[in-house]
Every structure is written in structure tokens, then in C-alpha cells.
């Protein structure tokens, strides 16, 4: 046991920042990646609460995505990757929010089936820290669900690999399109 904590909510931004700070301080490595698994709602207004990640216990014990970004920013470390094993964390809004706290994001733009990510198939690639290996992580996810589907299950999934440094460019280009078509969009 490296450190024990009193009972607390893991979706509290101060708790998350402290645990990550402790983890980084105790580690001899200089590069870090994160895996988060839970429930999430992205920016969907039809899901309550909108812009939420995680659920600690029952009820509304969730963390708003902007608070999660703030918690990760507080550790003053840019992560090599964040893998979100949670629904809706691959949307553009979420990717833009996390653009300054990690280099790459691996996630699903839709629901993540109960099977989740097939960790045993891709852990050997995840911590190598290059885009080609992150692509292999995504391919293992695709292969896993293709295999389930071919076995007659109704399993399906989506996965995305997002290069965070491209998010500002995407936002800039999207803004140009919105301005250019504002009259059409108003209707």
C-alpha cells in the first residue's frame, strides 16, 4: 500500500487533483497516461446531468467535465493520453475541453457497451506513447466488437483517437463555417 485515503468522493475535483498529485510524486517515471471508466453524458441536454463524468455511489455524485479538466490541469502535468471507458466522451466538445491536459484521447462518441474496452488485448500498446500504438489500441477495440458481433451478439461500438493539438485548428475552422453560414443556421 503506497497511500491510504479516508472515505471521500472520487468525483470531487480537489480529491482527484490530490490523488493524481500524490501518484505523480511517488512515481519515478516522467510520462503518464490516464484511464477513466464510469458513466458520462458529454454535452447532451437529454441526459441529466449534462456535461458530467463519473458516478461515485448513488444519485448525483458526478463531476462536471469542466471541473474534471480543472482537476487535471491543477497537477501541472500534461498526460500522454487519456482513455475514457465511458459513454459520449469522444465528442468534439469533450475533446476540445481536454485539449490542453493530454496529447491524445481515446474514447467513444456514443455509448460504450457493458463489455467496455478489452484491456487484455491492448495494454501492451497503450504505454508506448506513440500514435501508431494508440491506433493499435483502437484496432483491438474494433476487432473485439467485430468478434462479438460475428458470434451473434448485438454488440457494437465506436472508438476515436483524437490528437489534442488539432482541436484549436478544428475550432477555428468550425467557427469560419458557422460565420459563413450564419443565416442558414439561424433558421
Question: Locations of the language-model features?
Answer:
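Functional beta-strand-loop-alpha-helix junction segments that form "active/interaction loops"
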Residues: 1-25
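Terminal, contiguous helix-loop blocks that mediate binding/assembly
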Residues: 14, 21, 25-28, 40-42, ...
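Short beta-strand segments
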Residues: 35-37
